[in-house]
Design a protein with these regions (language model features):
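Substrate-binding cleft of carbohydrate-active enzyme catalytic domains
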Residues: 1-168
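Substrate-binding groove of N-acetylhexosamine-processing glycoside hydrolases
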Residues: 34, 43, 91-112, 119, ...
Length: 337
C-alpha cells in the first residue's frame, strides 16, 4: 500500500520540523504507527510518498521561499493552483527536504520510499528562475530539464542516508508519443512506476535495456479515480476522465506482449486511486472494487491462463461478500445478467 502523502491538494502527514505544512486534517505519528502495525499483521507493507519537485503547492503555500524566485509572490491556492515547483537552485530546499525525508522515513518500516518526480512543469518554473538558470550555467547545462539531475542527486542522497530505496514516477523526454529517452538519467537503484498509458511500451523497453526495475500502473487500466461507466464522473477534479471499465482493468497485460525474457525487471502492478477525486470512504471503496480484483488477477496470472469469461463468474461471489460486510462497491450489472 503506497500512501501519497503530499500534493497540490494538501499535505497529509505531520512534520515536526515544519509544523505549518499540515492543515486541519493529517496523519499523526501515532496514526502512522497504528496503520503500519495493522497492515503488518496482514502482511501488507505501507510505502510513503512525498511528491517533489512538482505537485508541491500545499508546501509552497506555507513556505513560499522554497518556490522559484518569480513564483514566490504568486497566489497559491491549495487544491486549485498547479504547475508550481520547488526551486532547484535554492540550497534551503534540500535542507528542508532532508528534514522531511528523515522524519517520514522514521515513521515507516518499509525499505522503500517514493519521491514523485512526475508532471514537473519545468518551462514555467526552472526555465524562468534566476537561481535555476545560475545553476544551469554552473553545471554547463543546455536544457532546464537537466536540473532534474542535481535536484534528485540531493533528494535521493537523503533517501539513501535514512535507509530507504527510492521509487520515482517514470517520465520520458516527451509527455506523448513519440519519445525515445528518459526525462533525465535515473540512478540505477531507482524503481520506476510506469503510469502514462501511451508511453508505457517505450518505457518498458528502455527500462529493460538500462537495468531499471519497474512497477506497472498505466492509467487506462490502473487509475481507479477514472469512471467505471459512462456518466460515473467524480464529484471532484472532474477533468473529463477516460473510462476504465471492469473489463478494461482486467485486460491489463503488464508485459505489453513482450516475451517473458524481457519482463524480468517488472516488479509488479499498482492500482492508483487519487484522493482529490474521492468525496469519502464509501466512494473510495466503490471506485476500487471490483476493479482491484481484476488488477490482482492481472498481476498474478500469465496472459495465456487468463479468461474474462471465467473471471466474470468468479468475481460476483466476491462482490457479494463485500456487500454483505457493508462495503460500498460498484455492482457490475453488465456481467451479472
Amino acid at each position: 500500500l503506497q500512501l501519497h502523502l503530499s500534493d497540490d491538494q494538501g499535505w497529509s502527514i505531520w512534520i515536526e520540523t515544519y509544523p505549518k505544512l499540515a492543515g486541519s486534517r493529517f496523519y499523526t505519528k501515532q496514526d502512522i504507527q497504528e496503520l503500519v502495525e495493522y497492515a503488518e499483521k496482514r502482511h501488507v507493507q505501507v510505502i510513503p510518498e512525498i511528491d517533489v519537485p512538482g505537485h508541491t503547492v500545499s508546501l509552497l503555500a506555507k513556505y513560499p521561499d522554497m518556490a522559484c524566485i518569480h513564483q514566490r509572490e504568486a497566489e497559491k491556492i491549495i487544491g486549485k493552483t498547479g504547475h508550481m515547483m520547488l526551486c532547484a537552485g535554492n540550497e534551503e530546499v534540500y535542507v528542508m527536504m532532508d528534514d522531511i525525508i528523515r522524519e517520514v522515513a522514521g515513521m515507516f518500516k518499509s525499505p522503500l520510499m517514493h519521491l514523485g518526480g512526475d508532471e514537473a512543469d519545468i518551462p514555467k518554473n526552472w526555465a524562468k528562475c534566476d537561481l535555476c538558470r545560475l545553476l544551469m550555467k554552473k553545471k554547463n547545462y543546455t536544457e532546464p530539464a537537466q536540473l532534474m539531475i542535481p535536484f534528485f542527486e540531493n533528494i535521493l542522497a537523503s533517501v539513501r542516508k535514512y535507509g530507504k530505496k527510492p521509487i520515482l514516477w517514470f517520465e520520458l523526454n516527451n509527455e506523448y508519443p513519440p519519445a525515445d529517452d528518459y526525462l533525465f538519467p535515473y540512478p540505477k537503484d531507482v524503481v520506476l512506476v510506469s503510469w502514462r498509458g501511451g508511453m508505457t511500451p517505450t518505457g518498458l523497453d528502455l527500462s529493460a535495456e538500462r537495468g531499471h526495475n519497474v512497477i506497472m500502473a498505466p492509467g487506462e487500466h490502473c487509475y481507479y479515480d477514472y469512471p467505471q461507466y459512462k456518466g460515473d464522473l467524480p464529484e471532484y477534479n472532474n477533468w473529463g476522465m477516460p473510462m476504465t471499465t471492469l473489463e478494461r482493468a482486467y485486460r491489463l497485460d503488464p508485459g505489453y506482449g513482450r516475451p517473458l525474457a524481457k519482463q524480468h525487471h517488472i516488479w509488479g502492478v499498482m492500482g492508483a486511486l487519487w484522493g482529490e477525486a474521492v468525496i469519502d470512504i464509501n466512494r473510495a471503496t466503490y471506485m476500487s472494487f471490483p476493479r482491484a480484483f481484476a488488477l490482482a488477477e492481472a498481476g498474478w496470472t500469465q496472459m495465456e491462463n487468463r479468461s474474462w469469461e471465467s473471471f466474470k463468474k468468479r468475481v460476483l461471489p466476491n462482490v457479494n461478500e463485500l456487500m454483505k460486510a457493508g462495503v460500498s462497491v460498484r455492482v457490475p450489472f453488465e456481467i451479472a445478467r
